[in-house]
């Protein structure tokens, strides 16, 4: 998300402060903004050394560029240098909230007075909290109320995420991707996600037997990596579906538009699992951008990504029978799939896109940023 901000904020109006990684220089060349990288790998910014280096570097950057507002792409670790800039330079900051980090934070502030104090210093001192879905916003309000930050809770803003309709679009030739990933025959269901329990891939595998009873030959492609692949593959074999479920592994972003176009239906049956949940469901709007009808789990922030009865169907993600029923309904009705897919594409063109997201964020930061310094005479 922060990369999209850096690409789409008006040129020279934003300075990006972040960690280093191999190949960063080539990546930074695409941005119209100044990108200032701390001399520490991004994966190490959460360490004490990383936080100290980032905070010092951000302070030096602030003295040079005189920022009027700071966006934190996540509460931790970005909240630490942002809080320091507020204390030392009076720069207000906004925090973008996704969901899972708030579930974890809520659990911690119940157990630890120190965690509550830290949360008040980082989250509670923000000028504004922006949530990526209504579900995330509700969770943010709950956490803020528990921290005694009622005014901030009342001001939580909701900015649903988007995608890039120029990249994800209908009509991309899928033949090469079909051949490369072995997606012959069909119909094909598709999920693009990390292989974790809260993504609901296991529930879709369980639903697949009921789908194949009504629509023989239906198969399920899963693009992504994660720790649960062995268990998910074993589940498919145990259910006699080993040949019907294809794990594609990591799929390059360049291949994703063709992969979506190779599928007949997208399924994103995410659900709450322990302290993990789906804050929005960006792959659902990527699928919509490609003209695919979608089946989404009625859980977390997914209802903000799927317009039930317009761009797809929402189902109970904890019930494989409900997932199967939603899939069967759409596989049985090509006209309905086409209507949902076309509506999804329109929704991306008019709302679920990064240009709209950035406009919303510019509008929000304009309400909190410091006044512009007087013009030099």
Predicted regions and their residues:
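Acidic donor-binding loop of glycosyltransferase active sites
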Residues: 244, 261-276, 292
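A short, active-site helix/loop in glycosyltransferases that binds the activated sugar's phosphate group
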Residues: 20-22, 124-158, 163-168
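Conserved acidic donor-binding segment of nucleotide-sugar-dependent glycosyltransferases
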Residues: 307-309, 313-320, 329-335
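Nucleotide-sugar donor phosphate/pyrophosphate-binding loop at the beta->alpha transition
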Residues: 50-53, 89-94, 102-125, 138-141, ...
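N-terminal subdomain of nucleotide-sugar transferases
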Residues: 1-39, 372
């Amino acid at each position: 998300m922060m990369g999209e901000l850096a690409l789409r904020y008006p040129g020279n109006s934003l300075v990006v402060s972040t960690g280093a990684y191999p190949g960063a220089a080539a990546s930074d060349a695409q941005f119209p903004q100044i990108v200032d990288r701390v001399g520490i790998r991004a994966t190490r910014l959460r360490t004490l050394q990383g936080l100290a280096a980032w905070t010092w570097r951000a302070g030096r950057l602030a003295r040079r560029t005189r920022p009027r507002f700071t966006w934190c792409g996540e509460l931790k670790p970005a909240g630490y240098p942002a809080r320091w800039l507020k204390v030392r330079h009076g720069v207000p900051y906004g925090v973008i909230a996704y969901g899972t980090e708030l579930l974890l934070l809520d659990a911690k502030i119940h157990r630890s007075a120190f965690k509550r104090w830290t949360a008040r210093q980082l989250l509670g001192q923000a000028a504004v909290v922006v949530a990526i879905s209504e579900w995330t916003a509700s969770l943010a309000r709950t956490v803020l109320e528990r921290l005694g930050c009622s005014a901030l809770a009342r001001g939580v803003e909701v900015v649903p995420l988007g995608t890039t309709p120029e990249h994800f679009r209908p009509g991309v030739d899928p033949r090469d991707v079909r051949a490369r990933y072995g997606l012959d025959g069909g119909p094909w269901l598709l999920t693009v996600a990390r292989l974790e329990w809260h993504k609901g891939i296991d529930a879709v595998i369980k639903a697949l037997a009921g789908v194949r009873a009504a629509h023989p030959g239906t198969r399920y492609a899963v693009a992504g990596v994660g720790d649960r692949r062995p268990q998910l593959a074993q589940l498919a074999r145990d259910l006699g579906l080993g040949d019907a479920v294809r794990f594609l592994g990591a799929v390059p972003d360049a291949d994703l538009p063709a992969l979506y176009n190779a599928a007949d239906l997208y399924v994103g049956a995410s659900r709450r699992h322990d302290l993990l949940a789906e804050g929005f469901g960006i792959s659902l709007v990527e699928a919509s951008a490609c003209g695919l009808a979608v089946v989404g789990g009625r859980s977390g922030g997914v209802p903000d990504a799927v317009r039930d009865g317009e761009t797809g169907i929402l189902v109970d993600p904890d019930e494989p029978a409900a997932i199967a029923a939603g899939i069967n309904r759409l596989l049985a009705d090509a006209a309905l799939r086409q209507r949902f897919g076309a509506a999804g594409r329109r929704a991306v063109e008019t709302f679920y896109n990064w240009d709209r997201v950035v406009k919303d964020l510019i509008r929000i930061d304009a309400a909190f940023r410091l006044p512009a310094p007087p013009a030099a005479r």
